[in-house]
Curated annotation (Swiss-Prot):
Catalysed reactions, as listed in the record: ATP + H2O + 4 H(+)(in) = ADP + phosphate + 5 H(+)(out)
Organism: Mycoplasma capricolum subsp. capricolum (strain California kid / ATCC 27343 / NCTC 10154)
Function: Produces ATP from ADP in the presence of a proton gradient across the membrane. The alpha chain is a regulatory subunit.
The protein, known as: ATP synthase subunit alpha
Superkingdom per UniProt: Bacteria
PROSITE patterns: ATPASE_ALPHA_BETA (PS00152)
Enzyme class: translocase
GO cellular component: plasma membrane; proton-transporting ATP synthase complex
Subunit architecture: F-type ATPases have 2 components, CF(1) - the catalytic core - and CF(0) - the membrane proton channel. CF(1) has five subunits: alpha(3), beta(3), gamma(1), delta(1), epsilon(1). CF(0) has three main subunits: a(1), b(2) and c(9-12). The alpha and beta chains form an alternating ring which encloses part of the gamma chain. CF(1) is attached to CF(0) by a central stalk formed by the gamma and epsilon chains, while a peripheral stalk is formed by the delta and b chains.
Site keyed Required for activity: positions: 362
Its membrane topology: Peripheral membrane protein
Amino acid sequence: MSFNIKEISEMIEKQIRNYNKEVVQTEQGTVVSVGDGIALIYGLDNAIMGELLLFSNNVYGMVLNLEEGAVGSVILGDETLIREGDIVKRTNKVVETPVGDALLGRVIDALGQPIDNLGPIDFTKTRPVERVATSVMARKSVSQPLETGILAIDSAIPIGKGQRELIIGDRQTGKTAIAIDAIINQKNRNVKCIYVAIGQKDSTIVQVVEKFKKYGAMDYTVVVNAGASQPASLQYLSPYTGITIAEEWMESGNDVLIVYDDLTKHAVSYREMSLLLRRPPGREAYPGDVFYLHSRLLERAARVNENYGGGSITALPIIETQAGDISAYIPTNVISITDGQIFLSSELFNQGVRPAVDIGPSVSRVGSAAQIKSIKQVSGTLKLELAQYYELESFAKFGSDLDETTKATLDQGAKIIQMLIQKQFNPLEQVDQAILLLTIKSHLLKWLPLDSIYNFKHEILSHFKNDQQAAKLRKKLDEQKTFDDQLQKEILKQAQKVVLKITKNIKEYKPEAFGNITEYQNLGK
């Protein structure tokens, strides 16, 4: 076989002449070590913080550590598919989540993927999960009430749209119940809701979703679930996914309520990742930036002015305490970030007071500006009366020699507590709350025995809905949202009828001992 050197040289020359220089640049690195949801990668010198990385087998990771010569990444998927020596590619993108109305009624994971077996989500837009909080000049002061339907909260610890109100208490004190009630009460109020479950049992989430479906709340709610079976990276990411979905609605002019259940587990998942990434531990082994972890999340909840959409995000973060210790690291951090807290007491819970709101240490720093006038008129002395009751109650245990004023204060306080007891999934309209609070303020309860207070509450609400004259007064109060002297007197006359009806049916009970109810002078004052 002979070779024609001339033909070969011409062929090579032709190929050289037709050669087009195209450089396709892809940055890739190699997995040095992997374990516990963390991968150490060599060779990605230009990776940026929070960037999405693509491992082999289509598993994604997120950059959280930038070290000299290596990159620390958390794995957002099944780490068992990753081996040492695997190739890792940069995507030049950060983590994004789908947003928009297509998410309503769905249960999604921290990456925005549906996990409710209802098929894919038909979304048209995504947003990066990390974003700088709304600027000061874009914000608007809180002035509209967010109605929870819970008498103890709406009267003494009111929440406004755009506020961050912490729900804090020991385990099994009804923290989630308050948040669920608040979401259920938003039905027909044009408020979209997001429930973020962090580190919860899957069985618990199923129960919550079933409750939402039962009361029609899933029509305006999206559930973001990063359960206890999910890796720490997804538990860490889930609240940011939730607030990103909320921001899209806020900028479209909608009011949004978001619940984080709970941020204690969120901090624990971040601590786990930080320790595995070899970051220096601080107090309680949390990393130094654990305050920033929650502040950058909660500062994204706001009420914005019309130039930025005119919507609002109201946040209800939940924190679980150990033995009522609100001075621990994470509770104090979140208390200092939020605009107030609802403190739930295990002692009250065990006494049968549900919701177990301890009104003493509970406070709402900005919500009072959002309270409607009718409730503000009749709830002003509520906290003071309860504070006096709790103070006197502790002294009353030591002796039975009490003067009449002290006895009256103790009696009124005990009856107020009974009035504030409310069953779950039974939210109250604001007009009904105003009527109940008026009966408390006017000391009408002194004609009733303690064990008939709960019945009185049910009867008076029923009376103002079913009695023709009382229903007209209720409607008038609902429309004008304030008490004038005449309306107040007429409502209390109707309330007197209910008191007389109840006391008449109690054997051997003499309400005359407290004076003539029809001639009582404090009514209406």
